[in-house]
Every structure is written in C-alpha cells, then in structure tokens.
From Swiss-Prot:
It is a peripheral membrane protein. It comes from Danio rerio (Zebrafish). Required for the export of mRNAs containing poly(A) tails from the nucleus into the cytoplasm. The keyword rRNA processing does not apply. This is Nucleoporin NUP42.
Amino acid sequence: MPVCNFFLQGRCRYGDTCWNEHPTGGRGGDYRGNQQPSNRGGFGNRVWINPSQRGGGGSSSAGGSNEWGRGAASARDVQSSEFSFSQNRFSALETQRAGAEDTHTTLDTIQKEMEVWQTSGQWPFSCYSAVNRQISGFIELCPEELRLEYYTSRASGDIQPYINSVQQLANQWRSRVQELRNMSSSTQISVIAELKSSSPPASAPGFGSPGPGFGSATSGFGNTSLSSPPAGFGGAGFGSGPQSSSTFSFAQSKTDFGASNTQQASGFGSSAFAQPSSGFGNPAPSAASFSFAAADSESKPSAGGFGSASGFSFKTATAGQGSGFGSGFGSSSGFGSSSGFGSSSGFGSAFGSAAPAQSSSFGSTGGAADTQSGHGLFTANSELTPEELKEFMAKRFTLGQIPLRPPPADLLMI
C-alpha cells in the first residue's frame, strides 16, 4: 500500500479511513529509506516532474531524478518525525476518553441536575451519582417500603413516629440538594475528594438510624442491632434487634399479615414447621395469612398448614359445619358423596388432619337432593319452561334462545 503524501505533510483529511498507508512511530522513515531509487522522482502518490524542467540539465536527468527522490524522502522523514503524527483529527477523541473527567464540568453537571431534581417534583428518596460514584447524603427508599412502614405503624396504633420520620428524611433531602445546588468552596472540595476517593462510599442511614427515624427495634428497615442472628424470611430481618418481629414474617407480634404471637416470629427458615402451632408460625386458633376458611370458634388447635384459619376467608365456618377447603385430602366429598380419602370434612383441614365438620362448602351429604336442585349439575323437568325444554330436546339450539340453566339428567346421553 502506498504511503499517504498528505499524511506526511500533516494535512490528510481522511484520517484512519484513508486508503493509503499512514506510518506510525519510526516506520515511515525506515520504510522510505529502504526503497530503491526510482526514475519517477519518488513513489506512492507523488507527482512526477520532468527533470529537464528543473535546474539540473538534461544530461543528468536519471541521476538528478534519483537524487531528487531521495532528497524529498529525507525531507519528508524529518517533517514527519518532527510533527509526531499529531495532525490526525481523531486522536483528540482518544485523548479525551483516556483522560480524567473535567472537574469543573462535573461540578456544573451536579448543580444543574440538583436544580432539576428540586423543581421537577421527582421522587426525593433516591441515591444520586454524577460519574461513577454515589454522592453521599441521599437515601434510597421506594414507595413500597414507605407503605409497609405505614401499615406497620398503623397496626401498632401509633403512626406519629412514621410521620416524623418521613418529615425528617424530606428535610434532610432538601438541605442536601440545596447544598449541592449552591456549592460553596468547601462543598466543592469535599465533593471532588469524594469523587476521586477509592474507598467505598459510606452507606446512608436508614429508618433505624439514631434519632427519630423509623424506630430502633420496631423498624424492619435498618434497626440499631447489628449482632442479631440472621434469619430467613421469618426471623429478625433487615438487621432488626433480637426478639423483634420481622417485617415480612407471617407470624409477627403486630402486623397486618398475622395475629398476635407470644413467641418470636419464625417464618420460613426457622422452627415454624416443628411446632404444634403452625400455619407459617401462627397458633392454630389465630388467622393464617392466605387460607381460605375463617377461624372456627370451637375447632381444636390441631396443626394447620395451608388450611388453618384465614384472614382472607371465603366462607365463615361455624361450630358444626365444615370449612370450605378446610380439612385435608380425606373428607366428605365436595359434591355430596362421602370420603375422598377416608376422613370426614369438606376438603379437610391441613393435609389430612381430622376436623369435626361434616358438611362442605361445595355441597353436603344429601347427594341426590342437590343434583335435582336449581343450583346443582342438572335441572329438574318441572323447573324448566316449555321453551327451555324444547331447546334441550331439539337437535340444535336456536340462536338467541339457548337456555342458561343446566339440562335435565334424563336428556343427557353418555
């Protein structure tokens, strides 16, 4: 590939996309010095000049041409070595990427973004990073975390600590944003030192920080105790103190997800399944989290897994009546017949335990009594109108006149 003459002169407009070679370092001079003399007055994309038109005379045209070519190459070698190939317009971009970020530009960016953050009404409780490191003084909280803290405070009967904590965090955010928006010289020095520091950034204080935050031992997000043993989902989570209830436990002492419990909440990872009282750590008479049957006032405190008493009840069980989805796999059949697996209750309590109930939410032991009722699988002939009976007896239904009730049992062909 020929060497680019304009690159040697320092004015190649194509840069790295040039079709000719751009030698780097000391290769250019060595490459041209090792070339054989040429009668064209040079090589590459240089223009040949007639030696007779120069001051050398016609008799020495060949020799003059060779001398001129070598002389031009030597001159260009000196020019290229002095220029150091810095005329490439794309090298400035590489130098900019390799260099450090401009400090003043970074500070101006921080000030503008603080102004936008303060006036735009965006979510305030969020961290902030200008380049690749976080700026201290901000706390990261999502709306769901605040909502959970509100529900926890409301369940305890006192929401004033929650209100005070949110107001304190909002005031801290406003003061920090105002400080970064109107930086003093000391603030600029501290921000620059923080951006250039190699140590990990200090974590922002959470709800459980000293002061009127979201409490110390009662909060689920950053309590003061750091020495409590870690637990799964049910233990003292998120750094809470010992003997405190977890935020996400199904068996807290005071929460919306479970009833009162005199013991420490165990949750998924502790001894909830080994205790006689269950339902994810709750005692049997209390309400479990996601069960389908309400608590029976006279039921026995047997072990109740998924079938214990529920806060999301679909049917309230009374003292002589079975709960819907209540008993285990063996119960009187949900549709009237007896015993799927051997015990008696409507779909049973937790996985096979006995229940004093006899009836089911899906049906009773009456059997044929419900099959002929309007709420069963079939409809009696006496309850159908002549038009409906005619439609059931026809080979095809008439559009717009299809009955909305089940057909009689004697018209079904199995």
